[in-house]
From Swiss-Prot:
It is a multi-pass membrane protein. One of its GO terms (cellular component) is plasma membrane. One of its GO terms (biological process) is reductive iron assimilation. The lineage of its organism: Eukaryota, Fungi, Dikarya, Ascomycota, Saccharomycotina. Disulfide bonds: none annotated. InterPro entries: Fe3_Rdtase_TM_dom, RBOH/FRE. This is Probable ferric reductase transmembrane component 8. It comes from Saccharomyces cerevisiae (strain ATCC 204508 / S288c).
Length: 686
């Protein structure tokens, strides 16, 4: 087969405008496939997605998913090495492209004119599902509206692409038939060109760099253009699309009515924490919809004194989402806000909308009085006394261990969960990555049980959205046999443990590959950290202070972080470190700069590390409940008490949560996916 025959084959099989088809039947097929596309789209969004979210919570389905992710598609498999496996964006792109391509091409019989008409009609048919995905909160069960935004973005991209192709092919069809000038003078076609221009404007401003440059411009263009597109498409489409327009208007107006219903005005108090963080407070009674679960969020808008500006803010609700850092029963609602573009003025009025509940499937509020005699609680560490059961901190927790990673102001998501999970006897670890050690001052404004909290101070400059957590995805065959794990305890000493020691009696034993080897062969290190020499650490003094003067001076913070030469004084010696309140001395600053607080007090139970954490086998061992006490001579305690049972049954009670910057959430999600664990991420970044 030569090149000429290949070209001729394509010419014969490619769609063409020369196909002779009855105009009436062509119109019927275009309407038929667009309606089927609309119906199936709503079935996928309203039935299949919630059903999948529900099935993931069942033990049987979790075991299947765990086996596939942790064993079949582990790091040795070729599937794991592909970008498609890890990138949700690529998966959605492929699914949306195949889905729409089927309805565009199926049954067209090579008629390019019918395909062109279908592109326009299907892009209109996808508008109601596209707008439905933006509803806040989502009416779908077991579904957080933030989790639907990636699907919303890819459907919108497909709609824009089909609109462009629809316009281009129609212009070409008019040109070859010498009707371009005549057709383009008709008003409906002009409306179509204007709608395409608005689609392109939305696409350009939706690029990530444009969004980060000016989110306000992106939002205004997005909101106004959406309404205008609905109007222009209504008058452009032939035959009419009254039912599509009705659905679109109902969705948008319903969202407006609900937003106004849960919006109120409050007067806030601003408490400065550091140069980068502030605490916003207002009474719980001013919140229109009281929160039920911890980790919810609300949306805030400025209350303008000018009536016209207030009307405009209701017309185009440019709101900022913030996670509620206080627990639902507190009298004050507290928000930890990163100082930036959002203006913060104490004793001023703001519009507040919400609260919006999180989608944490393992936690719920008891709806009926708890009977002490029943065995509804599977947690053996839970105190079922009547006084604690009647506490506002009492929740039904369907998890035994919760591992959380947050970055920057994402600590708002972790603090209320940490307090409630600790109260209900759940083993919990909270890793907070922060750039500035002064942000630790925010902990003193919250009444909390900080057991299980670890703070990693990167000491680097930049935007909060650039905060990351490391997950090095590689496989070393030698590590399966003898893997040395380096970790830093609260006393600053380095403990090295091999994988074999976890299940041994003290004598070396040959290791056989097991179902946990894939993740337990990874190294858990603290990036850019060199443990200090013991001789360099002086004895702990009576003041029990932590001095960061040489660790994070302004002139050396970037250099020291890169070389891992951070230094501590009188803070990493003795097992009692971080078990009592600590006092941090800030680094020396330039005299010209504003004076910083003399000392920063850290609550008891908090562990502080330097650098950036790396997720690995030590963290997975913690999820498996196989971590060892480094100070215990005998390693008999390292045996997993229930090693005979199916470990997937236990891991179904383990959850991994992440909140904050996109990079941190993606790394945590990949680590949790490779381990076959439940994962929930929450990010307001678009």
């Amino acid at each position: 087969m030569n090149l000429k025959s290949i070209v001729s084959w394509f010419k014969e099989h490619l769609p063409s405008f020369d196909v002779d088809v009855d105009k009436h039947f062509r119109t019927l097929r275009v309407r038929k496939y667009s309606q089927i596309c609309l119906l199936i789209s709503f079935i996928i969004i309203c039935v299949i997605i919630p059903l999948m979210n529900y099935l993931l919570l069942t033990d049987k389905f979790f075991k299947i998913c765990h086996h596939l992710k942790h064993h079949v598609f582990n790091r040795r498999s070729w599937v794991h090495k592909t970008h498609m496996y890890h990138k949700q964006s690529l998966q959605l792109c492929l699914i949306c492209f195949v889905f729409t391509s089927f309805f565009v091409i199926q049954g067209a019989n090579g008629d390019l004119l019918e395909i062109t008409k279908r592109m326009g009609r299907i892009s209109v048919a996808l508008m109601p599902p596209l707008l439905f995905l933006t509803l806040r909160p989502s009416p779908l069960p077991h579904t957080l509206y933030l989790a639907l935004l990636p699907l919303h973005k890819w459907i919108s991209r497909i709609v824009v692409l089909e609109s462009i192709l629809h316009t281009w092919f129609y212009l070409y069809y008019m040109y070859i038939n010498d009707t371009l000038y005549v057709k383009m003078r008709k008003l409906p076609n002009i409306y179509g060109v204007i709608a395409l221009g608005l689609f392109l404007l939305i696409a350009i401003t939706s690029v990530r760099y444009a969004r980060r440059w000016s989110y306000r411009v992106f939002y205004y263009v997005h909101y106004v253009s959406t309404w205008l597109i609905l109007v222009f498409l209504h008058y452009h489409a032939r035959p009419g699309i009254s039912y599509y327009t009705t659905l679109n208007v109902l969705i948008l107006t319903g969202q407006i009515v609900y937003r106004l219903h849960i919006t109120n005005v409050t007067r806030v108090t601003i408490v400065p924490i550091s140069s980068s963080l502030s605490l916003l407070e207002f009474p719980l009674t001013d919140l229109p919809k009281k929160p039920i679960l911890p980790g919810g969020h609300l949306r805030i808008n400025i209350y303008h004194r000018n009536f016209l500006r207030r009307f405009f803010s209701h017309l185009i609700p440019f709101q900022h989402p913030f996670t509620i850092a206080s627990i639902p029963s507190d009298n004050l609602v507290r928000l930890i806000i990163r100082n930036g573009h959002f203006p913060l003025r104490t004793n001023e009025k703001y519009y507040i909308t919400g609260a919006f509940e999180p989608e944490l499937s393992f936690i719920s509020k008891p709806t009926v009085p708890f009977n002490i005699t029943t065995k509804s609680s599977k947690n053996p560490f839970r105190n079922n006394s009547s006084a604690l059961i009647n506490s506002p901190l009492n929740f039904l927790i369907k998890a035994q261990r919760v591992f959380m990673c947050v970055g920057g102001s994402g600590i708002s998501f972790g603090l209320p969960l940490l307090r409630i999970l600790n109260f209900n006897g759940v083993n919990v670890r909270l890793l907070w990555v922060s750039r500035d050690y002064k942000d630790l001052e925010v902990l003193n404004h919250f009444k909390n049980n900080f057991e299980g909290m670890e703070i990693y101070i990167s000491g680097t400059e930049g935007n909060e959205q650039d905060i990351e957590i490391d997950y090095i995805d590689y496989h070393d065959c030698a590590a399966d046999i003898n893997d040395e794990v380096r970790s830093i305890s609260s006393s600053g000493r380095v403990s090295e443990l091999g994988d074999n020691s976890m299940l041994s009696d003290g004598n070396p034993q040959p290791t056989e590959p097991n179902e946990n080897t894939a993740l337990l062969s990874k190294k858990s290190t603290l990036r850019n950290h060199h443990p200090p020499k013991t001789s360099d650490i002086p004895d702990i003094n009576a003041d029990d202070e932590i001095d960061f003067t040489y660790a994070f001076s302004r002139s050396k913070s970037r250099k020291n972080t890169a070389q891992g030469t951070l230094t501590t004084h009188s803070s990493f010696n003795g097992s009692s470190v971080f078990r009592q309140p600590k006092i941090i001395e800030p680094p020396a600053q330039d005299p010209c700069l504003e004076a910083a607080p003399k000392k920063i007090r850290i609550p008891a139970g908090v562990k502080v590390f330097f650098g950036r954490p790396t997720l690995g086998d030590k963290d997975y061992e913690w999820c498996l409940q196989t971590e060892c006490d480094a100070e215990t001579d005998s390693i008999q305690c390292c045996r997993w008490a229930n090693q005979g049972r199916d470990h997937a049954e236990y891991l179904s009670q383990v959850w991994v949560l992440a909140a904050g910057p996109r990079g941190l959430i993606e790394s945590t999600k990949r680590w949790a996916t490779d381990g076959g664990l439940h994962f929930h991420g929450e990010s307001f970044a678009l």
